[in-house]
Amino acid sequence: GEKTISCPIMNANGEVLGLIQKNASEESTESYAIGAGYGASLSISALSMNDGSLNKIGIKKALPDTEDQALVFLYMSSEQLDKDSYLILINDFLAQYPNSPEGYIRLANYYLASGDASQYALADENMKKALDVATQKDEAHYQVAKTIYSYMISLEEGQEAYKEWSYEKALELIRKAVQSSAQPIHIQLEGDILFAQGNYADAFEAYNKVNQTSFASAATFYSASKAKQLTEGSNMNEVLALMDSAIVKLSKPYFGEAAPYFYERAELRAQAGKFREAVMDYNTFFEAVSGDVTALFYFQREQAEMQCRMYQQALNDINKAVEMAPEDVDFLVEKGSVHLRVNQLDEAIATFQKAISMNDQYAAAYRMLGYCQALQNKNKEACANFAKAKELGDTVVDQLIEKYCK
């Protein structure tokens, strides 16, 4: 009956065999017991945070039995617990594993994530503690350097850093890690810190070392390409070759995560005068993001298409840009210039007039409108527009005045 539910069943020696359970059927007269061994077999694992039954009972969970499992449990919990519960869990972890540098790094990151400058002293204290207790100093130096670097890149422009936290401090720590074990992941962070400092030549050297290891990936070649591009006196072909290497590392079919690589290479190819190849990369980018692009994308692709005389595609793209951003006068003027280029003078004139109605200080619009009118032998209107362009500071219009208005 009801009164016996959860009562123990024992054998003749007084050993508990199981606990009586309620029958799922109200009518049944049979009872069942859950074996005592079941309770003994219950344990908390790294994935217990996702266990629906354990979450329902609302009782605080113990940490898993090993430090590695407990660290995974901490990681899983960081996504699911509220801030206060997570703090209690980290402190429980440190009570159980007081010599775990990862625990102190977690606590430091917790205080940093609060965004409350008054908590930064606690973050600093925990980073120092991590370095103190670590037996693998290289890993601790890497973790603390990474934490300081992440903090530094999150600062707003002009915002002052906390006490001695700086890129220099992060660099000093990561170089200690690199000195004792030059792991690619350490050298990668060294490159990231140098890049953030604007030391692009040394950042490139670091990324280049990583790219000669099995750790090389699309991301590391991308970083090397950017660092090379920003290094003074760099060769554009070398920059492009590195971006090619990044793209070779991507797996097909290309999805969203591949998109930035193709966008970047499209821009590099356009800068190098390889416009047809640039258009191909813009097209791959477009497919990778399933056509979810901005007006600026259509404008940029149109620029490359114009350079390789793909006029119909260019016209389609600039029309799309204008449709998506009708308030952007630059796009409108570009649309007018495409019409002009393919000798659609009436469409060009209407477009430039619309641009001027939106911004009557746009010198280039007056110049190009005047040029269309000159081509239609309407020199009086043309010269009036050239004069307006000159008045507004246009520097190219003098040649047109010389040709049509003398």
Segments predicted by a language model, with ranges:
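Canonical tetratricopeptide repeat
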Residues: 106, 143, 189, 223, ...
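Helix-start (N-cap) detector for alpha-helical repeat units in TPR-like alpha-solenoids
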Residues: 101-102, 137-142, 182-185, 216-219, ...
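Register position in tetratricopeptide repeats
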Residues: 113-116, 150-151, 196, 230-232, ...
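Catalytic nucleophile loop of clan PA
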Residues: 2-19
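Structural marker of alpha-solenoid helical repeat scaffolds
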Residues: 96, 133, 179-180, 212-213, ...
